[in-house]
């Protein structure tokens, strides 16, 4: 068990959104839940009652009512085809703009090159109205796809809301994606319109995109129009005189598509993961309201690009009547405090980032900022215990909310709870409605032991389908081919004695040492604390004779890897964990390879060291730093000959 870091006060418990929801359910259903665990058990066994309670508690506006709440699919081997709120129609954007107020801004935006700008709710609504009129004039209809290659800015938010308001489907890539990577995504969905930034700044450098966007548009024959932000067409849209017009909302079936996200596409074409409008609306209000304690009037920020699902997740803070605070640019430009200063100056209540950024900030003393948000959120990779402890030292009054979920569900099914304590290295709880367990390889439940993260009941945030996935084959193979009738997520977890969760990394990157499986997060926990080591990556290469080699790669802050540092690393791994955690070889590399969404490329590196070519092992267009592969390719050739 990790160290107890934070406990909610009685006032925090009683005023929390999840406590208010618990009291609401108890009154409505004549029940009593003495603890969060009892509430969770009810929510995962009484699915219809729970999700109806979410809809009524958050006052979801249905244009037409539902006839049933949940209907199981005909095929019991998966959750594909589960029908939620049959007959219901609604609109996501309509739920955003019911929060319109002049008391606070809708958006606060800042980038590397622009001063902070506030956008009122009225200004945002008028911008969305103009974009809605333009899309309708083009002939965009419900179900059509509209795509963006956009920075995380005001325009991206307004465009999504306009697209959704007419029942069309949104899909977006970040402009730092490679041209082939963007084409691989958008050619699958055949968008009618493409919006894009002609340039953007990152780390103080200007990147021109106009020509590459032009070339992309020529390779997408479905396009009716391609609009660059700040070009003449965009300016004409914003100049429309619509003083007498009103924003209209198209009622959509509960399971109509809202947006299309994409798998990483590490080794092939990315899967086009399609989510339903009703599922996202209910799930995000539950996740933000109940599990991050996001309440009306708060200010919410999650640092993200538009190509990461956390952009969609953060957007839903607008559903909660929040001011959405947006920062676009490099996290360390001009220094590591840029994000923290923006959050402090913008009075952000809920500050969220990727775990890697928090790990990189450990050498900073942030107490001088005199900033204490309600919550500090982390996701993207496991947050090490020592980073929990550092955050607690810097922000003793803030609840640390570590999240885990994925693009697959566009949400977090492991998250926070203001009724519970925070322990170092642990996620507080399994979220309501998420029937998550840990399984061994035979499908047996595990408690207090490391196992595969599985979901035993459907959730409305699960994909409605993958775009152009005939007979749902890719969908089934992605989640249901390991355990019949059970969603296998691909993460390695342990459920603790007090029902917290410890993340151990991806199960497909698990290290097998003499039959004992080790999560990569344990290795990284030690390396993150090792002086002189900036970053690391570990793999296990299996051999035909049944043996294996654990290989550790380290990026140093300066100098060369020597025997003394190797010895220190091995000694710390042995002392803190076990002899099985000690690598067979340690190599120095210039950089650790990451995807654009911040994931370490463990599996592709394992494939390279197993003899696969770099070209077959990974699609470089999805990489943040493709040049980092050169060291791994060279080392693998030498290592395989030895």
For each feature predicted by the language model, list its residue ranges:
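AMP-binding/adenylate-forming catalytic core of the ANL superfamily
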Residues: 173, 177-198, 332, 344, ...
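Conserved pre-ATP/AMP-binding loop-to-beta segment of ANL
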Residues: 103-105, 228, 239-262, 269, ...
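Conserved AMP-binding/adenylate-forming core of the ANL superfamily
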Residues: 37-42, 93, 103, 107-161, ...
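Conserved AMP-binding/adenylate-forming
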Residues: 344, 375-403, 407-500, 507-510, ...
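Conserved C-terminal "lid"/linker of ANL adenylate-forming enzymes
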Residues: 225-228, 537-542, 551-552, 570-642
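Adenylate-forming
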Residues: 193-212, 328-332, 346-389, 401-409, ...
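ANL superfamily adenylate-forming
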Residues: 113, 196-254, 364
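Conserved AMP-binding/adenylation subdomain of ANL enzymes
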Residues: 281-299, 309-349, 364
């Amino acid at each position: 068990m990790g160290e107890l870091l934070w406990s909610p006060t009685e006032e925090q418990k009683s005023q929390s959104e999840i406590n208010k929801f618990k009291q609401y359910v108890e009154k409505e259903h004549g029940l009593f839940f003495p603890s969060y665990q009892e509430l969770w058990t009810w929510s995962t066994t009484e699915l219809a009652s729970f999700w109806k309670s979410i809809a009524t508690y958050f006052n979801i506006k249905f244009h037409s009512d539902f006839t049933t709440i949940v209907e199981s699919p005909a095929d019991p081997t998966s959750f594909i085809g589960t029908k939620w709120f049959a007959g219901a129609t609604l609109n996501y954007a309509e739920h955003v703009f019911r929060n319109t107020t002049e008391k606070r801004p809708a958006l606060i935006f800042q980038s590397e090159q622009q001063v902070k700008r506030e956008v009122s709710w009225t200004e945002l609504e008028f911008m969305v109205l103009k974009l809605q009129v333009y899309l309708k004039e083009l002939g965009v209809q419900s179900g059509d796809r509209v795509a963006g290659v956009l920075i995380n800015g005001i325009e991206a938010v307004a465009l999504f809301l306009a697209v959704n308001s007419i029942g069309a489907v949104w899909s977006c890539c970040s402009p730092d994606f490679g041209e082939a990577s963007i084409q691989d995504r958008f050619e699958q969905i055949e968008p009618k319109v493409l919006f894009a930034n002609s340039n953007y700044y990152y780390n103080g450098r200007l990147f021109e995109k106009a020509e590459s966007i032009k070339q992309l548009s020529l390779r997408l024959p479905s396009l009716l129009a391609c609009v660059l932000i700040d070009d003449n067409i965009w300016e004409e849209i914003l100049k429309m005189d619509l003083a007498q017009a009103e924003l209209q909302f198209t009622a959509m079936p509960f399971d109509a598509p809202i947006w299309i996200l994409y798998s990483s596409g590490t080794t092939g074409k990315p899967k086009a993961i399609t989510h339903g409008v009703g599922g996202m609306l209910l799930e995000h209000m539950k996740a933000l309201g109940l599990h991050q304690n996001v309440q009306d009037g708060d200010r919410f920020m999650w640092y993200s690009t538009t190509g990461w699902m956390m952009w969609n997740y953060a957007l839903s803070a607008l559903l909660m009547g929040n001011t959405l605070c947006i920062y676009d640019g490099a996290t360390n430009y001009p220094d590591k405090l840029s994000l923290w200063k923006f959050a402090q100056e913008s009075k952000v209540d809920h500050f969220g980032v990727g775990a890697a950024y928090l790990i990189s900030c450990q050498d900073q003393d942030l107490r001088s900022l005199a900033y204490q948000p309600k919550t500090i959120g982390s996701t993207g990779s496991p947050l090490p215990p020592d980073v929990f402890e550092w955050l607690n030292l810097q922000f003793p009054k803030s609840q640390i909310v570590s999240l885990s979920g994925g693009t697959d569900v566009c949400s977090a099914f492991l998250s926070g709870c203001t009724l519970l304590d925070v322990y170092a290295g642990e996620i507080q709880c399994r979220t309501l409605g998420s029937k998550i367990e840990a399984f061994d390889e035979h499908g047996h439940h595990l408690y207090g032991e490391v196992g595969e993260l599985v979901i035993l009941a459907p959730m409305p945030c699960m994909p409605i389908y993958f775009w152009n996935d005939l007979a749902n084959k890719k969908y089934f193979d992605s989640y249901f081919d390991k355990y019949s009738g059970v969603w296998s997520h691909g993460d390695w977890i342990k459920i603790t004695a007090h029902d917290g969760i410890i993340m151990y990394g991806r199960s497909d990157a698990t290290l097998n040492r003499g039959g004992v499986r080790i999560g990569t997060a344990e290795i990284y926990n030690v390396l993150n604390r090792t002086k002189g080591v900036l970053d690391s990556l570990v793999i296990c290469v299996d051999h035909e004779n049944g043996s294996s080699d654990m290989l550790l790669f380290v990026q140093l802050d300066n100098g060369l890897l020597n025997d003394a540092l190797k010895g220190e690393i091995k000694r710390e791994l042995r002392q803190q964990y076990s002899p099985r955690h000690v690598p067979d070889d340690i190599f120095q590399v210039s950089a650790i390879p990451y995807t654009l969404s911040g994931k370490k490329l463990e599996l592709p590196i394992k494939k390279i060291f197993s003899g696969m070519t770099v070209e077959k092992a990974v699609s470089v267009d999805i990489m943040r730093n493709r040049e980092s592969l050169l060291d791994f390719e060279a080392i693998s050739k030498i290592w395989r000959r030895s």
